[in-house]
Amino acid sequence: MLPSAVAAHAGAYWDVVASSALLNLPAAPGFGNLGKSFLIENLLRVGGAPTPRLQPPAPHDPATALATAGAQLRPLPASPVPLKLCPAAEQVSPAGAPYGTRWAFQVLSPSADSARLPGRAPGDRDCTFQPSAPAPSKPFLLSTPPFYSACCGGSCRRPASSTAFPREESMLPLLTQDSNSKARRGILRRAVFSEDQRKALEKMFQKQKYISKTDRKKLAINLGLKESQVKIWFQNRRMKWRNSKEKEVLSNRCIQEVGLQEDPLSRSALGFPSPCPSIWDVPQQHSSPRWRENSPEPSERLIQESSGAPPPEANSLQGALYLCSEEEAGSKGVLTGAV
């Protein structure tokens, strides 16, 4: 058999072994079932000019040709050489799980395969492909090699880590009664004072509306209270005292305004009797048309005021008072005669 024919048969054998191994292997990230890559970079490479394969130069000397053919000839192994899919570069995620970005096939010798897999014989054909086993200590979701980084040229997002969606055990517990009680410790409860304490506090408040720090400390020690309780009591008491003072001032103003706007008849109802009704009938006389006829004109009023003569209104008032005094004297005489 010629050396070229032997080399051709050997190359065909290696192609069959590699294709059979690839058919049994799961598809690598970015590769289809037929072993073709659908990544953008690989598609661009395929669409461009194919890279020429390096072929050894044709030997002109028959001796050199036999030497090269003998060097290319290798003994065929009894079992196919196993292939291993391993990541060429790994990236460590925040959670500690490796992300494989680049994948490459490594040809392992039967001795290395048997050394790594002591439980199986090197001639076992089922062991043609043995992927690297994930670490048992890491979670399952994080130990499996994610294909998101290699897919679509690395544009796909990586799966969310365990910290983004925590498990039920890591979630914070709901608010309980203990947490509520701890949160409410800072809120001061309303103090309940006894009668003696109230009397002592009220007595001190009547002396001074604003208590000093030393007096407050002494008063708290004597009454068995805290300084904060005494301070808050004085603040509330001063607020009540201010409100009561404001109410008193407003009530006094209202009484004064009502007193100024009272009618003469309401004065008699309040205890101011009017024995002479003619005095209060004077405004009615002013409104009568007869009084308007008898009343002088404004020019005549000015003349009377300049001359010093009393106005007719004063004369009418004096006459009414004189009549009232005569009536009172007559009523008194009648009462004395009856007695």
Curated annotation (Swiss-Prot):
This is Homeobox protein DBX2. Coiled coil: none annotated. CDD domains: homeodomain (cd00086). Residues 290-303 have a biased composition (Basic and acidic residues). One of its GO terms (biological process) is epidermal growth factor receptor signaling pathway. Its main location: nucleus. Keywords: DNA-binding, Homeobox, Nucleus. Residues 186-245 bind DNA. Residues 282-318 are annotated as: Disordered. Belongs to the H2.0 homeobox family. One of its GO terms (cellular component) is chromatin. InterPro entries: H2.0_Homeobox_NeuralPatt, HD, HD_metazoa, Homeobox_CS, Homeodomain-like_sf, HTH_motif.
